[in-house]
Amino acid sequence: DAVILPGTKNTISDLLWMRQNGLEARILKHSAQNKPVFGICGGYQMLGMEISDPTGEEYGGTVQGMGLLDTKTVFRPEKHRTRVHGTFGEMKGILKEMEGLPFEGYEIHMGKTELLEGCPMNQIHDTVKKKDRQIPDMEPENRIENSTDGISHGNVYGTYIHGIFDKEKIVSEIVKSLAEKKGLSMEEVEGVDLKAFKESQYDLLADTLRKHLDMKAIYQIMGMQK
């Protein structure tokens, strides 16, 4: 029903592997049937027209992308790290109901992706809040600015933001849109609050550790009084 290309530390190598093994052809066929394709980080880079690695950060040279988005990516030595909060801008295609929904996540990548001149694609301009030191080694910035976090064209979507599907409302809208395309009714879809789920799992882990470890001895080793 939908293809999500996730991030990777080996964008070019993985793209060539997918090309050699027929996966790229299947993704292109899927997109030609007007079914959604969503690329995240390295997956976003793969969806473009070209990926260039002039300084040999990963593979070296230039390779052709899948050609589903009119973008070009150039790898650079500097790694971009930042946490972002924003809102989906203008969305087209099957995910148009996501327009205006808030999201949060983080970026960590070594490439810069630019929209090719003269292409008719919709850029997703969002207000992004970059918080200071939310993840180790992230950019020490604390400001609000307008930024292009992704690009959509028809039913093809790309973004550098990891965690963009973590919010329950976003997941629900995606499931509803996919169901409606198949003629199914999903009016009462209830998603899972991922943040609350993670907290409950952390609590279970903490309870298990307290049950099976000598916590008093551990606190003494740490120099803490408990």
Regions found by a protein language model. Give the residues of each.
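Short, well-ordered loop/turn and helix-capping segments at boundaries between secondary-structure elements
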Residues: 33, 46-53, 71-75, 114, ...
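A glycine-rich phosphate-binding loop feature that marks nucleotide/adenosyl-phosphate handling sites
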Residues: 36, 43, 84-89, 111, ...
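Composition- and surface-driven signal marking solvent-exposed, interaction-prone regions
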Residues: 15-18, 119-123, 147, 170-176
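Catalytic beta-strand/loop cores that center a nucleophilic Ser/Cys/Thr
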Residues: 91-154
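Terminal amphipathic helices with adjacent charged low-complexity linkers/tails
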Residues: 2-5
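Cysteine-nucleophile active-site neighborhood
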Residues: 8-94, 99-104
